[in-house]
Amino acid sequence: MSQRVVMGLKAVQAVAGRTDPTAPLAVGALAQELGLTLSRASRLLAELDEAGFAERSGGYGAYRVGSRAVRLSGRAAAPVARSLRYAMTLAGQLTGETVCLAVPVAGGMRVIASVESLWTLHAPAEVGELITDADSAIVRSAPGRNETSGQPGQSGHTGDTRLLESTIGMSVEIATPVFGPDGDCVAVLAVRLPTNRYGQNAQRSRHAVDTARRSIESTLVDVQGRQRPPGDVAADGVTPPSALEAAFRVLEHLAAGRDSVAGTARATGLRADRVQRLIDACRAAGMVVASADRTRYQLGWAVHGWHRAAFAPTIVERAKPLVAATANETRTCGFITVLKGMRSFTLVEELEMAGEGLRMAPWIGRPHPMIGSDGGPTLVMDLTAEEVAELFPTRHSKHELVQFLSRVREVVADGVLTMQAYDDAGIVSISAPVRDSSGFVAAAVCIVGTTSYMRDNARTFEEAARKLAADVSAILG
């Protein structure tokens, strides 16, 4: 039974841990990856589908990540989501390069978070990417890896014993392990940059990586010091679930924070001896980690990447019809924008316009400076004023920062922001926050139209923006 649980959890990771977990994965491909017969893989995926951790997609015998897996990922990532975004975005601002976070998984290191460089020529790091090259600084920074001394930029040390560097092809990695309060390595943080910018950016990147690492480790100390949120206690007499369903319940309980076997048993309604066996299976599958004294358990960080990797394709596929419906109903232009570094990036747009002879220029796939973006203040509303000020581009004046922070406070207070376009006369935008399964603001919906038309219908359109944001948030889990 434990082996079936282990294989089921490995199947979940195979489906959810990809760069695009919403893309169809054929049963045959999964069977080959896990070394299963086709019939066994098919039965396993059908069970995952029934449980909500996978769902049918595309043609017959293909599956994608399930909504329950996305919710598990977001819930597990929630305690560190805001601080992680801030630390990595700041490192990206200081260097101009790609910043990524990776965790050990079977076969290598998996990228679970990334802030990609906005340079035309850059070294990418995609959430879900599996790093397998043994020479990679990210791989060598993980616990249990051999470290080869050498010169910076040549797969060696940098002088700081916590920093390693490597050059693979035309890309340089500067990496450092991130340790939890118990002394365990929870992840590896790195900057990736092209070799042609190494000379001018290496020292800056080392400093940025080290600063971000310290910030994340400080957050981990705070998180561990918090009391676990109270959870529901399972009712007595509940029919024992299947082994795989029982494992999922254990994972969902641990996603809210570390707990003991006894605490997990009380919360899930399972016997303590069964919980111990399930936790052992979850550890064997690489999804649960133990405290140093083996008395408390929590989800490993590998699951944190699932909801992030699913985010953009889900928005494009499932939120676009919602934006189109709102734009058509209100006779406005509708957009969904996300944060890319400290720029706003449009993922979805629907261009309608109340005004004969007028046209809105398309923004799809184009980054825009945060200060002039319709959704800019909304996208950073989870950050503190001090954090926003530190991230704010230095080319802008203090007056512009004060005005921007005022708009951030407004959207925090009202849940919606109406503002005149920064550098586009005659346009008013209304934005509202979209939250992913971690509860963190991951996008902004924007309704845009001519000044007179938007002012005349302000209350109606503000409610439309709130509803659209809530509907998109529901899609994300």
Please give the residue ranges for each predicted region.
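Long, low-complexity, charge-rich intrinsically disordered regions
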Residues: 127, 159, 163-166, 177-195, ...
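Juxtadomain coupling helices with adjacent low-complexity linkers
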Residues: 149-153, 157-164, 168-171, 185-244, ...
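Non-catalytic C-terminal interaction regions
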Residues: 332, 338, 342, 348-356, ...
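Short, basic/aromatic recognition patches
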Residues: 79, 83-91, 137-176, 204, ...
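A short, hydrophobic, proline-anchored segment that marks a local hinge/packing element in signaling
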Residues: 174-183, 430-438
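Long compositionally biased, domain-poor regions of proteins
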Residues: 93, 181, 216, 256-257, ...
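N-terminal helix-turn-helix
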Residues: 1-74, 218, 231-310, 470-475
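Amphipathic alpha-helical effector-binding/dimerization core
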Residues: 64-149, 304, 308-392
